[in-house]
Swiss-Prot record:
SUPFAM superfamilies, alphabetized: Acid proteases, DNA/RNA polymerases, Ribonuclease H-like
Gene3D superfamilies assigned: 1.10.340.70, 3.10.20.370, 3.30.70.270, Acid Proteases (2.40.70.10), HIV Type 1 Reverse Transcriptase, subunit A, domain 1 (3.10.10.10), Ribonuclease H-like superfamily/Ribonuclease H (3.30.420.10)
Taxonomic path: Eukaryota, Fungi, Dikarya, Ascomycota, Taphrinomycotina
Name the UniProt record assigns to this protein: Transposon Tf2-9 polyprotein
Pfam families the record matches: Integrase_H2C2, Peptidase_A2_2, RT_RNaseH_2, rve, RVT_1, SH3_Tf2-1, Tf2-1_C
Organism: Schizosaccharomyces pombe (strain 972 / ATCC 24843)
Transmembrane segments: none
The keyword Ligase appears for this protein: no
Region (Disordered): 209-229
Gene Ontology cellular component annotations, sorted alphabetically: cytoplasm; nucleus
Gene: Tf2-9
UniProt binding sites for Mg(2+) 2: 990, 1050
Ranges annotated as biased composition (Polar residues): 218-229
Keyword Disulfide bond belongs to the record: no
UniProt record, GO biological process: DNA integration; DNA recombination; proteolysis
PTM statement from Swiss-Prot or TrEMBL: Processing of the polyproteins proceeds by an ordered pathway, called maturation. It involves the initial cleavage of a 27 kDa capsid protein (CA) from the N-terminus of the polyprotein, followed by the cleavage of a 56 kDa integrase (IN) from the C-terminus. This leaves a 72 kDa protease-reverse transcriptase fusion protein (PR-RT), which does not seem to be processed further.
Length: 1333
């Protein structure tokens, strides 16, 4: 081995440090210890086998070895493989042939039938030992762990690894693959015995002293090498350059390289002596290959010296059917159009066949990747790196545990498992085993569990996740906001040095609150398990993690840290300050037992990649992969692919000047009336867009300390603006660009109004920057008259201008004039507005501007973005530009907006309820109905189930329920009272009042037999008492017809008095009461009263004061008329004959007048049948005018009609239509309900009401908790209790009703309403209950 080879090997070995390497699973600890002892020369010897000795003794030793290390030899296969590796080559071939013929042979039988086993030297045995277990361990992890354990010199260990990599950790059939490895290892293998390492090391040390700074390049082995002479690269970078190679023998051949993305092929030189891939400028131009600047310019030596300052993006190329992805340096001249270096071939495991002049790709073998080291200054925090921590159950942190709050406890999830193929079954078992071992999951007995599914990782492996979608429907949302990207970037301004930290298994660092674990149960073929840590997939996890990390970081996040989920960026203005900041953050993470993923961390960088941007001191640019996504886009074949392309472009829109002008030819193809036809115009448009992205502009961080300039302009159809800031070189650099189309109404504005609209829209767009400036910022406009309109203090010309001037008062600015020729940027933006941006609706000039009821403030945007994280579909749209383009959805200021200019919101959230409340209760329309409210809200917002949620809210609105009348058909079918068996058993009574006074009487007592329909009419007064009524009933009814069995009457105080109760008890009849103001309950009496009144009008209409004189005639006329229900006269049914009604007529007597005679029984039977038939007809007719009965349950809240029942009715047209609500106590009949009335009115009204007088009170505590109309609250007598709903305090109060001052009511009202009614008693209650208002 040459000295140069040794120096190179040593440099490579030094870069591989054990402390930078990942750990390995503890289940393989025995194997680690075994090989650590091998390297430490403490190998447990099985013994060199003598072929002349007994085979059984060697089998015994092997069996003992297998028993000592059970985890290394878990099955027959591993033991048999180990045995094969300890046979000589011929015996090994013989044994393998035997096993192929008989796969059931054991390792003992293989040894016995082979006949002899020959040991070998230590190096060979070590090699075979590694080979025997190469498939049991991940090679990279195994080597890293091994290096950290070996008690040998680090240098020797690393050289040993260099030897083992190509020779021992390959599959058997590729044992000779090491011959094609890099020549340093090939040369080193000439002296591969570990015993000679030390001698070689000492020899090279002596050589090194003598040679001093001798060049690494030797003339005899660099003749054909090409040198890279870097112009701006340090010596350290130069020594570690991956293109350096001083010993490799050069081989060249030319192949045709296919570029499928660009549909072309180019001759390509395969040059093992080349140090980098190169391509000529002519080739780049000919095939329109996208390039970008290369910051590390180099001078490329050789025959064609070139200065290189550009390179291509990563291109997909195909060589002999082998697909690779690589980039090329662009040179002016070269012998071939392109060249591919040995490094590219090596990185892609491509081997050159010099005899066949072809390439072949070997199976990929993972490489040991250099990972970032933890700087020495932070070594004290080494114990929080993933390399020193395996995943384990974290300790709970009080107040930061993950809580799973459900909207209901009695829920059931669908029981189903997703089918899993064998490959995924193995991945599932690995995940379950690892989770059980680390303690983050455990077996569960939960009755509800969600299924598991698998998603691919970036590296191609599978990740098991739980599909918590069914559970998320019942999880209460977490409204903690996720930070806005723009606000995070704004905090970085002024920083020059950055450190990025990434948390390892971030979600699994948070414990689940004790008692909530069963809610996170998941189901798989192995059983049911539950998480003890916060899992992925639960809807509230992102918000809780953001709250968790913000709490851990504390005040640091306000000064020197920005974090988005598990990505943490520490930024400082100086190196010394940065060390303090990093230590502060690491200490906070250490205190919380959090672990960082060192492989993804970057320390003390001048620029970093963070949340999709490359961030530096100067500003931020988009990440290269997002740019490459556009640069590599093929020509769209249809509208769907074109929308996807424009979606990717729109994501980078803020970095592409004149976006709309560039996309205009493409947008034309998306119009409905345009036929799809791809022309060179569209092709050129895509090329122009790609060219703009080759070197995107750097947008500066906004700095509140720097001067601000806002340039605006308006064209006929659009407005535009650019926001800039003045930097130390006295130049203005852009912070952002803005352009927007005008609506149809805005197109009709005057020129001055359009120019002012440009200012208003720009200020709204950058409000978070411009509203809080201390010094005034400048606004430049090219419309001179606009300055006077804004600075003029006279009365505004119209309401729109008045609103604008009021809006401008929130900003501190001065406006100046600049001609349009100088204001070129804003002028261009106003004329080149992005046609993909939605046009706002025509609502600017409406007299009632419903759309602007909700102001789109920053707080509102934050709340919307937070809600997005809890909705899987909207979160997918937020993160997937292609999906947005496909569904014609825009992303504007963090909000998703559809083609109708509606903001998309998650369904049924606190935010949507707030929006409904704003428009329904606080809008310019007074409590609009369902349809009107839906149409108003749909002008600006939409979400799934919007109509259903609005309907629920309006139906639950207390104000609407008690004040709006119902137009539906009355409730409750007619329930006729069954007829009695004979006359005068069942009677009905009532009074006809409001009659003119006649002979001292002003009322009429009416008694009707419900069987015969006979009526008894007795004149009386309105002031008749219960005692007088009883005497009158005794003399005029009982004396002639005997005692009745039951009497039906209304709830008049006479019939409910104690006197009447005693009278009923004396004559042994039962009183039944009809419902108040429900005439259908006792329809017979009502009908009789109507007939009597009609007859009285006929006989005394000219002399109404003589009605008493005609009562006997009216009674006789009524009782001798054939009744429609019985088809007979009442008199005939009762007396069994028909009296003479005129002097010419004789009475008709029956031969059998005995009531027990057969004829009388037959008559009664016929009457009863007629009554039943009449009841059926009457019910059928009545029920045609009603709707299905509303069934109430005890405990339901109902309202009582005021106007129809007179219940709590105040003679006031503005009084509420309903009283209540009241609780239902019980059902007292088919259609009647008894209500729980307040004690103060129980004596005034019956507590039983027919269902037709009731309306269900819809009460959803999440929507509206108040049950009292605030206008009805008079004096508050007492406060019973309080509740908090949605941060609003509600009080349950007893009060005197304003509508009925004699009535004491109770119900729920808001604190604000209660304070207006009685401030003193409310304040006393707050003080006594220690309420924090």
């Amino acid at each position: 081995m040459s000295y140069a080879n040794y120096r190179y090997m040593k440099a490579r070995a030094k870069r591989w440090r054990p402390e930078n390497l990942d750990g390995i699973q503890t289940s393989d600890e025995h194997l680690i210890n075994l090989f650590a002892k091998i390297l430490s020369k403490h190998v447990p010897e099985i013994g060199k086998f003598d072929p002349n000795k007994d085979v059984e003794s060697y089998i015994s030793k092997l069996d003992q070895h297998f028993t000592e290390y059970p985890s290394l030899f878990p099955n027959e296969h591993t033991k048999r493989q180990y045995t094969l590796n300890h046979l000589e080559e011929l015996e090994q071939q013989f044994a393998e042939r035997m096993f192929s013929e008989n796969g059931s042979l054991t390792w003992q039988e293989l040894l016995r039938q082979t006949g002899k086993v020959q040991g070998s030297n230590k190096g060979d045995r070590l090699t075979k030992t590694f080979e025997g277990f190469r498939n049991q361990l991940d090679k990279v992890q195994f080597i890293r762990k091994l290096m950290s354990k070996a008690n040998v010199d680090d240098f020797h260990t690393r050289l040993f690894i260099l030897w083992m990599l190509p020779y021992s950790l390959r599959k058997l059939k590729e044992r000779n693959y090491w011959k094609s490895e890099i020549s340093e290892i090939y040369d080193f293998l000439e002296d591969k015995r570990t015993a000679s390492y030390g001698k070689t090391h000492k020899r090279f040390q002596l050589q090194n002293k003598n040679l001093g700074k001798e060049s690494l390049s030797k003339k005899n082995n660099t003749t054909n090498s090409r040198n890279l002479r870097k112009t701006n690269v340090s010596r350290i970078e130069y020594s570690s350059n991956k293109f350096l190679n001083h010993t490799r023998k050069r081989y060249e051949m030319v192949l045709q390289a296919e570029l499928p993305d660009f549909k072309c092929s180019i001759p390509c030189l395969i040059d093992t002596g080349a140090q980098a891939n190169i391509i000529t400028e002519e080739t780049v131009r000919a095939h329109k290959l996208p390039t970008r600047p290369w910051s590390k310019s180099v001078i490329y030596g050789g025959v064609y010296p070139n200065k290189i300052n550009r390179k291509t993006i990563k291109l997909n190329i195909s060589l002999n059917g082998i697909s690779i992805k690589t980039e090329f340096l662009v040179v002016k001249k070269f012998s071939h159009p392109a060249a591919i270096s040995f490094t590219t071939l090596y990185d892609n495991n491509i081997e050159i066949s010099s005899s066949k002049h072809t390439l072949s790709q070997m199976n990929k073998v993972s490489n040991i990747v250099k990972e970032p080291e933890l700087p020495d200054i932070y070594k004290e925090f080494k114990d929080i790196t993933a390399e020193t921590n395996t995943e384990k159950l974290p300790k709970p942190i009080k107040g930061l545990e993950f809580e799973v709050e459900l909207t209901q406890e009695n829920y059931r999830l669908p029981i189903r498992n997703y089918p899993l193929p064998p490959g995924k079954m193995q991945a599932m078992n690995d995940e379950i085993n690892q989770g059980l071992k680390s303690g983050i999951i455990r077996e569960s007995k939960a009755i509800n569990a969600c299924p598991v599914m698998f998603v691919p990782k970036k590296e191609g492996t599978l990740r098991m996740v739980v599909d918590y979608k069914p559970l998320n429907k019942y999880v209460k949302p977490n409204i903690y906001p996720l930070p806005l990207i723009e606000q995070l970037l704004a905090k970085i301004q002024g920083s020059t040095i950055f450190t990025k930290l990434d948390l390892k298994s971030a979600y699994h660092l948070i414990r689940v609150r004790k008692g909530d674990e069963h809610k996170l149960a998941f189901r798989c073929p192995r059983g049911v398990f539950e998480y003890l840590v916060m899992p992925y997939g639960i809807s509230t996890a992102p918000a809780h993690f953001q709250y968790f990390i913000n709490t851990i970081l504390g005040e640091a996040k306000e000064s020197h840290v920005v974090c988005y989920m598990d990505d943490i960026l520490i930024h400082s203005k100086s190196e010394s300050e940065h060390v303090k900041h990093v230590k502060d953050v690491l200490q906070k993470l250490k205190n919380a037992n959090l672990i960082i993923n060192q492989a993804k961390c970057e320390f003390h960088q001048s620029q970093v990649k963070f949340i999709g941007y490359h961030i530096s001191e100067k500003g931020f640019t988009p990440c290269q992969e997002n740019i490459d996504k556009v640069l590599q886009w093929k020509q769209p074949k249809n509208r769907k692919e074109l929308r996807q392309f424009l979606g990717s472009v729109n994501y980078l829109r803020k970095f592409i000047p004149k976006t709309s002008q560039l996309t205009h030819p493409l947008n034309n193809l998306l119009k409905k009336d345009v036929r799809w036809k791809w022309t060179p115009t569209q092709t050129q448009a895509i090329e122009n867009i790609k060219q703009c992205l080759v070197s995107p502009p750097v947008l500066r961080h906004f700095d509140f300390s720097k001067k601000i300039l806002l340039e605006t302009d308006a064209s006929d159809v659009a407005v535009g603006a650019v926001l800039s800031q003045k930097h130390d070189d006295d130049k203005y650099y852009p912070v952002g660009y803005y352009s927007a189309k005008m609506s149809k109404a805005q197109l009709n504005y005057s020129v001055s109004d359009k120019e002012m609209l440009a200012i208003i829209k720009s200020l709204k767009h950058w409000r978070h920057y411009l509203e809080s400036t201390i010094e005034p910022f400048k606004i430049l406009t090219d419309h001179r008259n606009l300055i006077g309109r804004i600075t003029n203090e006279s009365e505004p010309e119209n309401k729109r201008l008045a609103r604008w001037q009021l809006f401008l008062q929130d900003f501190n600015f001065e406006i100046n004039y600049r001609p349009g020729s100088a204001n070129h940027i804003a002028d261009a933006l106003s004329r080149i507005v992005d046609e993909t941006e939605p046009i706002p609706k025509d609502s600017e000039d409406n007299s009632i501007n419903f759309v602007n009821q909700i102001s789109i403030t920053d707080d509102f945007k934050n709340q919307v973005v937070t809600e997005y994280t809890n909705d899987t579909k909207l979160l997918n749209l937020l993160n997937n530009e292609d999906k947005r383009v496909e569904e014609n959805i825009q992303l504007k200021d963090g909000l998703l907006i559809n083609s109708k200019d509606q903001i998309l919101l998650p369904n049924d959230t606190q935010l949507t309820r707030t929006i409904i409340k704003k428009y329904h209760e606080e809008g310019k329309l007074i409590h609009p109905g369902i349809e009107l409210l839906t149409n108003i809200i749909l002008r600006r917002f939409t979400w799934k189930g919007i109509r259903k949620q609005i309907q629920e809210y309006v139906q639950n609105c207390h104000t609407c329920q008690i004040n709006k009348s119902r137009n539906h058909k009355p409730y409750g079918p007619l329930q006729p009272i069954p007829p009695s068996e004979r006359p005068w058993e069942s009677l009905s009574m009532d009074f006809i009042t409001a009659l003119p006074e006649s002979s001292g009487y002003n009322a009429l007592f009416v008694v009707v037999d419900r069987f015969s329909k006979m009526a008894i009419l007795v004149p009386c007064t309105k002031s008749i008492t219960a005692e007088q009524t009883a005497r009158m009933f005794d003399q005029r009814v009982i004396a002639y017809f005997g005692n009745p069995k039951e009497i039906i009457a209304d709830n008049d105080h006479i019939f409910t008095s104690q006197t009447w109760k005693d009278f009923a008890h004396k004559y042994n009849f039962v009183m039944k009461f009809s419902l108040p103001y429900r005439p259908q309950t006792d329809g017979q009496t009502e009908r009789t009263n109507q007939t009597v009144e009609k007859l009285l009008r006929c006989v005394c209409s000219t002399h109404p004061n003589t009605w008493v004189d005609h009562i006997s005639l009216v009674q006789q006329s009524y009782n001798n008329a054939i009744h429609s229900a019985t088809q007979m006269t009442p008199f005939e049914i009762v007396h069994r004959y028909s009296p003479a009604l005129s002097p010419l007529e004789l009475p008709s007597f029956s031969d059998k007048t005995d009531e027990n005679s057969q004829e009388t029984i037959q008559v009664f039977q016929t009457v009863k049948e007629h009554l039943n038939t009449n009841n059926i007809k009457m019910k059928k007719y009545f029920d045609m005018k009603i709707q299905e009965i509303e069934e109430f349950q005890p405990g339901d809240l109902v309202m009582v009609k005021r106007t129809k029942t007179g219940f709590l009715h105040k003679s006031n047209k503005l009084a509420p239509s309903f009283a209540g609500p009241f609780y239902v106590l019980q059902k007292s009949g088919p259609n009647n309900y008894e209500l729980d009335l307040p004690d103060s009115i129980k004596h005034m009204f019956s507590s039983t009401f027919h269902v037709s007088h009731l309306e269900k009170y819809r009460h959803n505590s999440e929507l509206n908790y108040a049950t009292i109309d605030e206008s009805d609250i008079g004096t508050i007598l007492h406060i019973l209790e309080h509740k908090n709903r949605e941060q609003v305090l509600y009080l349950n109060v007893k009060y005197i009703s304003n509508l009925n001052p004699s009535t004491i009511m109770s119900g729920w009202t808001t604190l604000a309403t209660a304070l207006q009614a009685d401030k003193a008693i409310v304040n006393d209650y707050i003080k006594n209950n220690n309420l924090n208002i």
